[in-house]
């Protein structure tokens, strides 16, 4: 059936994280869930639809917190992208933690840039964590912050979302890919947002890499 959410014109009226009321439709040995109602959302994250500029795409709903993964290079995450994303999460009342990922790969000048960015964002109240999945640096810190919550991981393609998720919950075994040498950008491994129940009383929403983030109706 078709669903319309009051006040929202989106390409996907049902999103990852939605809570719904449904009926079971049984045909032979197969049962299919038929959604009857979408329960009012506590919050949601949206971005402009790529092909339909007047419409939006709901990335996920009912989120307790977001981990925004940032890399200084391979690929670079620019401050303009970070700021637009933080404006959106603040507007929708979603706590956001900045994860400076691949910390083991940076040279001295790149480390200085991370410290500069951390000073800026910590001064306005955002928690910043330096993480290395390969060296297991602060992976447990991220994991502890996730307990009892639904967390969304987001960032550009290639920032190491899937690698970090695998370090947190190895049984998920999410696919990862190397950075494209030609374009210095990540290659998509996650093609749609997906929620996973984790073994330590937490849920994670893994999202596709985002090239740009357009603010909508704020």
Residue ranges of each PLM-predicted region?
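Conserved ATPase-coupling elements of RecA-like P-loop NTPase cores
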Residues: 78-79, 107-113, 214-217
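Conserved beta-strand/loop subsegment of P-loop NTPase cores
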Residues: 62-70, 93-103, 125-130
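Conserved, well-folded catalytic cores of nucleic-acid-processing
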Residues: 41, 69, 73, 88, ...
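Conserved nucleotide-binding/hydrolysis micro-motifs of P-loop NTPases
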Residues: 26-29, 40-43, 72-75, 102-106, ...
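Conserved G1/Walker A P-loop phosphate-binding module
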Residues: 1, 11-28, 136-218
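N-terminal accessory targeting/assembly segments
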Residues: 1-79
């Amino acid at each position: 059936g078709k669903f319309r959410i009051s006040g929202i014109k989106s390409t996907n009226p049902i999103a990852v994280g939605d809570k719904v009321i449904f009926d079971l439709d049984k045909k032979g040995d197969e049962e299919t869930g038929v959604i009857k109602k979408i329960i009012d959302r506590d919050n949601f994250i949206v971005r402009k639809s790529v092909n339909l500029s007047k419409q939006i795409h709901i990335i996920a709903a009912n989120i307790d917190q977001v981990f925004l993964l940032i890399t200084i290079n391979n690929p670079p995450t620019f401050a303009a992208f970070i700021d637009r994303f933080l404006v959106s999460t603040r507007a929708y009342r979603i706590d956001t933690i900045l994860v400076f990922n691949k910390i083991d790969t940076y040279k001295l000048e790149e480390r200085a840039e991370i410290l500069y960015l951390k000073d800026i964002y910590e001064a306005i109240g955002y928690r910043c964590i330096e993480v290395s999945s390969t060296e297991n640096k602060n992976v447990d810190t991220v994991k502890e912050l996730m307990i009892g919550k639904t967390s969304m991981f987001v960032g550009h393609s290639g920032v190491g979302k899937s690698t970090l998720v695998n370090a947190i919950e190895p049984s998920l075994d999410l696919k990862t890919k190397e950075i494209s040498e030609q374009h210095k950008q990540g290659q998509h491994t996650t093609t749609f947002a997906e929620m996973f129940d984790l073994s330590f009383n937490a849920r994670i929403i893994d999202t596709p890499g985002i090239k740009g983030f357009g603010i909508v109706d704020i």
